[in-house]
Curated annotation (Swiss-Prot):
Co-factor requirement: Mg(2+)
HAMAP family noted in UniProt: Shikimate_kinase, Shikimate_kinase_2
Self-association state and partner proteins as the record states: Monomer.
Name assigned to this protein: Shikimate kinase 2
Keyword Iron tagged: no
List of residues binding Mg(2+): 16, 32
One term under GO cellular component: cytosol
Localization (cell): Cytoplasm
The protein's annotated pathway: Metabolic intermediate biosynthesis; chorismate biosynthesis; chorismate from D-erythrose 4-phosphate and phosphoenolpyruvate: step 5/7
Entry function: Catalyzes the specific phosphorylation of the 3-hydroxyl group of shikimic acid using ATP as a cosubstrate.
InterPro entries hit by this protein: P-loop_NTPase, Shikimate/glucono_kinase, Shikimate_kinase/TSH1, Shikimate_kinase_2, Shikimate_kinase_CS
This enzyme's EC code(s): 2.7.1.71
Amino acid sequence: MMQPLYLVGPRGCGKTTIGMALAQATGFRFADTDRWLQSHVQMSVADIVEKEGWGGFRARETAALEAVSAPSTVVATGGGIILTEYNRRYMHRVGVVIYLCAPVSTLVNRLEAEPEAELRPTLTGKPLSEEVREVLEQRDALYRETAHYIIDATKTPAQVVSEIIAALPPSTQRLQGDVYT
């Protein structure tokens, strides 16, 4: 059994999309902390934040992180999971942390194209491009500090998955046919 693989990065970097594809390529299970949390409390992230504030949401997010962390699991985390020092240390110690890095323009384009965009609470109350830029400026150093690997997430999901697999130790990779994928 391999330690969990944690995908971190801002909204729109592809954590869920890449996570599902990476799980399929490695034969790992897939978990998403936001989806796990929403299914267990039967509320959207926006509703949790509205009822409990960001502090309440962050506490629930830590519980979700611990609940989904298991060997041979790819975990897509919420964009702000790295704001809690415990979460950063936990992921770095327990698993392999992969920062999916993308520029503001890519993130904004992806977020604008997302059908679930209205379910995500605004973090600053500002226009999307301004919010993404500010949030990334605040969090980039934390993503980098937490990550074992930093991967360019501007490419296609298949290319990103291939780059992640190439960066990981061979014991993480699943042999498909005669080649590692």
